[in-house]
From Swiss-Prot:
Gene Ontology BP, a term: proton motive force-driven plasma membrane ATP synthesis
PANTHER family documented for this protein: ATPASE H+-TRANSPORTING V1 SUBUNIT E1A-RELATED
Activity across pH: Optimum pH is 6.0 for ATP hydrolysis.
Pfam families: vATP-synt_E
Similarity comment: family membership: Belongs to the V-ATPase E subunit family.
Name of the featured protein: A-type ATP synthase subunit E
HAMAP family reported for this sequence: ATP_synth_E_arch
GO molecular function: ATP binding; proton-transporting ATP synthase activity, rotational mechanism; proton-transporting ATPase activity, rotational mechanism
Thermoactivity: Optimum temperature is 80 degrees Celsius.
Length: 203
């Protein structure tokens, strides 16, 4: 199953769960409002002697507070759904390196990172699995592409393995600059966009 299909399935599952949670929240909202109305009527009867105007004001205040509470519960339910969808996407992110197209994506991440750092002598840090996936000949070919883009002689060397789900971390040889193109970092950099798209899709 491709990444897009996986994401679509996750969002569809999350939407079904969203409908369930929102239905429960709506039912809770109705109960809160009904109880508030009953309480308001009761309180109204008790203070009628103080004047109808004061009674109506008290009733309105109680109902208003109940509506705010119900709205809060709905917002909490939506946030729970969004977090659930994000967590599922994170789980699928860990599985991305198992996809056949992953090597090409990894090569592009290395290339983009090297170009962003301006070429030169760079250290490519990968996890243990990807250290085997990216051989020296792949890095040699990338050196030429980076040189063409940056107009600077480029040398790419693999550094010590790093604990990431996938992707790469590129560092200058002097250690002064680095670019984190790990899958986790890319996900976090795009988290606001991801949240917005999930919200649009579900609600």
């Amino acid at each position: 199953m491709g990444v897009d299909k996986i994401k679509s399935k996750i969002l569809d599952d999350a939407k079904a769960e969203a409908n369930k949670i929102i239905s429960e929240a709506e039912a809770e909202k109705a109960k809160i409002l009904e109880k508030a109305k009953e309480e308001a009527e009761k309180r109204k009867a008790e203070i009628l002697k103080k004047g109808e105007k004061e009674a109506e004001m008290t009733k309105s205040r109680i109902i208003s507070e109940a509506k705010l509470e119900a709205k809060k519960k709905l917002l909490e339910a939506k946030e729970e759904i969004i977090e659930m969808a994000i967590n599922k996407l994170k789980e699928e992110l860990v599985k991305l390196p198992e996809q056949p197209e992953y090597k090409d994506k990894l090569i592009k991440l290395i290339k983009d990172g090297a170009i962003s750092l301006g070429g030169g002598e760079l250290i490519v840090r990968l996890n243990k699995r990807d250290m085997e996936l990216i051989d020296d000949s792949t890095l040699w070919n990338l050196e030429k592409e980076v040189e063409n883009a940056t107009k600077k002689v480029t040398v790419l060397k693999k550094g010590e393995p790093v604990d990431i789900a996938g992707g790469c971390i590129i560092e200058t040889a002097d250690g002064l600059k680095s670019l984190d193109n790990s899958l986790e970092a890319i996900f976090n950099r795009n988290l606001n966009v991801i949240r917005a798209r999930i919200t649009e899709k579900l609600f």
